[in-house]
Amino acid sequence: MMSDFGEELTKLAVAEDNPETSVLSKTGMHFPWLHKHVEAVVTGGKKRKDFAQTTSACLSFIQEALLKHQWQQAAEYMHSYLQTLEDSDTDKRQAAPEIIWKLGSEILFYHPKSNVETFNSFADRMKNIGVLNYLKISLQHALYLLHHGMLDDANRNLSKAETWRYGEKSSSQEVLINLVQAYKGLLQYYTWTRKKMELSKLDEDDYAYAAKTRTMLSQSCKTSTNICALVKTPGVWDPFVKSYVEMLEFYGDQDGAREMLTNYAYDEKFPSNPNAHVYLYEFLKREKAPRAKLISVLKILHEIVPSHTLMLEFHTLLRKSDTEEHQKLGLSVLFEVLDFAGCNKNITAWKYLAKYLKQILVGSHHEWVEEEWKSRRNWWPAFHFSFFWAKSDWKADTDLACEKAFVAGVLLGKGCKYFRYILKQDHETLKKKIKRMKKSVKKYTIVNPGVHT
């Protein structure tokens, strides 16, 4: 059944010159390395005739070759593994097409001698063998074609899959059909964006402008139809949601866009997804929504990803709020951002923290700072304010070092290693800034005089 694909693999493989270290395939090809591995499946010097053990060993060799990116060797093993399609074990025989597709497509994608024609041939044969996997294979085949810039071929592939049916339609089959339709919608969205770009270069009075506008409207209707069913199904559908919302906004359907994004972010049937809240926030921001609404959206994002880049915007919104609860949360947000190693050189975060610490301490909210510092007192000094970091930060970015030095001085006192190191640096341009920092630390530090860290 798979002899044609076997021939394709044979073409890809290159035999070794030494026939003694090879195994002859049914197609007459010598397979290097295979002989010694087959010999490993022996008992008392005799080859096991057990079909399952042979194919199991072959599968292990394929997986090992894939992990090592040995595509040619994997192709050779794959040629032998095709016999699993004739396995006497019903379960294994039924599972074989999906395994062969996954392994074979991986090999053909990366093999240096593979090409689009070979991949297409393999995909088409696998669709007919593994009918239960038809939709999955069709979708992955389309993605492969997209990767190679073959948009029309990918679209035809998806259109064919869209109308395919096998037996009674199951719920899993319905989701796959929706996914196929949604990817078709993405292709239509791509065409729509190109038309939009062309439209932006035309004069509104131009005849071509009206024609392209009509084409775009038609394209957007098709896209909406194809994407709608999928985004109502619980799941993570970021690229589809973004595309759909962009078109809704372009045609002035703000209510439709808002409803879509709100459902995507808050519907409990959908999995937790930080991007859903990001998209909603960005939309509301474009709409110039009230600060309270923006804060409510970012508050949930903060709970999911406290180190998200939008947390600095969240802090700014909280800082400008009139409620003490928000202002206090604004301090927590900054500390939590800087709890993450990936943010320890974020100069904006350190600037915000330095400025906000001063503002809070002037406003007599000493206890807010103490509360945040209590849980960090034992690990932040080594994490942020060691002698090593003082030297490293000063060498890399003097502005960052100065901001951190002020924060270190406020939290740990003027005896802090980081603060003392920066204070001793002889830098003509920053001399006045360091002098002012010294005075500020003396004024605002939360550490009792005489305490050194």
Swiss-Prot record:
Signal peptide: none
Subcellular location: Nucleus, Nucleolus
Residues passing through the membrane, by range: none
UniProt KW Ribonucleoprotein keyword: no
Pfam families in the cross-refs: TAF1_subA
GO-annotated molecular function: DNA binding
Subunit record text: Component of the transcription factor SL1/TIF-IB complex, composed of TBP and at least TAF1A, TAF1B, TAF1C and TAF1D. In the complex interacts directly with TBP, TAF1A and TAF1B. Interaction of the SL1/TIF-IB subunits with TBP excludes interaction of TBP with the transcription factor IID (TFIID) subunits. Interacts with UBFT. Interacts with CEBPA (isoform 1 and isoform 4). Part of Pol I pre-initiation complex (PIC), in which Pol I core assembles with RRN3 and promoter-bound UTBF and SL1/TIF-IB complex.
Protein name: TATA box-binding protein-associated factor RNA polymerase I subunit A
Organism this protein belongs to: Mus musculus
